[in-house]
Design a protein with these regions (language model features):
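Short alpha-helical segment of the dimerization/phosphotransfer core of two-component systems
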Residues: 4-9
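Conserved catalytic submotifs in the C-terminal HATPase_c
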Residues: 30-33, 52, 57-67, 103
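Short helix-loop "hinge" at the ATP-lid/N-box region of the Bergerat-fold HATPase_c
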Residues: 86-87
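Conserved glycine-rich
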Residues: 92, 160-161
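Short beta-strand/loop element within the Bergerat-fold HATPase_c
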Residues: 93-106
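Acidic ATP/Mg2+-coordinating residue in the GHKL
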Residues: 114
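Short conserved segment of the HATPase_c
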Residues: 119-133
Length: 182
C-alpha cells in the first residue's frame, strides 16, 4: 500500500512539474520534426500488456510518415495520456481509434475515440480541469492524478491547437483536437 501511494505521489509531482513548465516558459519549448505515426505506434507497443489484459483493440490510423514541427515530449504527453485514459476508464472489450481526419494549410485535425462507456454530459465541459475526476473513487484506485487531460489541453494549446470531448452516438468518448503544422 505504501508503495502504491509513493508511486502515486511521484506521478503527481511529475504531472505538476510538466504543467508548471508549460505555463512558466511556453516560449522556451524546443521544437523538432516529430513523426506522430511512429510515436503512436511506439505508445501502443508500450501499453500492449494493458490492452491485452482489458481485451482492447487499438487502431492507429494515422497516415504513414505524418510529421509535424513540435515538442516531442509534449506531443508524447498528448497521445500517451489519451491512450492511458481510454485504457483506464473506457472499460473492457472495447476499441480505441486514433486518426487524422482532415488537413488544411494550417492544421492537422485528429480524432482519438473509444467505444467504451463515455461520460455523463454534465462532465464533458470539465474534463480538462486540473484534478477533476468523473468518478473520484475509481480514479483514485486506478492511480490517476487528475492532471492528465489538463496536460493534454495545455500541450495542444502550446502547439497552436484546440481540443474538446464529446460522447459518440454508439457509446464511448471522442476527443477532437487540432495541432498546428508549424
Amino acid at each position: 500500500r505504501s508503495y502504491a501511494q509513493s508511486n502515486r505521489l511521484a506521478h503527481l509531482l511529475r504531472d505538476i512539474s510538466v504543467l508548471t513548465r508549460m505555463e512558466e516558459a511556453p516560449n522556451m519549448i524546443e521544437t523538432e520534426p516529430v513523426n506522430l505515426t511512429t510515436m503512436m505506434r511506439n505508445i501502443l507497443n508500450e501499453v500492449t500488456l494493458e490492452l491485452e489484459e482489458k481485451q482492447i483493440t487499438a487502431h492507429n490510423m494515422l497516415p504513414e510518415g505524418l510529421t509535424i514541427q513540435g515538442n516531442s515530449s509534449l506531443l508524447y504527453s498528448i497521445f500517451r495520456n489519451l491512450t492511458d485514459n481510454a485504457i483506464a476508464y473506457a472499460g473492457t472489450h472495447i476499441s480505441i481509434t486514433i486518426r487524422c481526419f482532415r488537413e488544411d494549410e494550417r492544421f492537422y485535425y485528429f480524432s482519438f475515440s473509444d467505444t467504451g462507456v463515455g461520460v455523463g454530459p454534465e462532465h464533458l465541459s470539465r474534463l480538462f480541469e486540473r484534478f477533476y475526476r468523473v468518478d473520484k473513487g475509481r480514479s483514485r484506485k486506478l492511480g490517476g492524478t487528475g492532471l492528465g487531460l489538463a496536460i493534454v489541453k495545455n500541450a495542444v494549446i502550446l502547439h497552436g491547437g484546440t481540443i474538446f470531448a464529446k460522447n459518440t452516438p454508439g457509446g464511448g468518448l471522442e476527443f477532437i483536437f487540432t495541432l498546428s503544422k508549424e
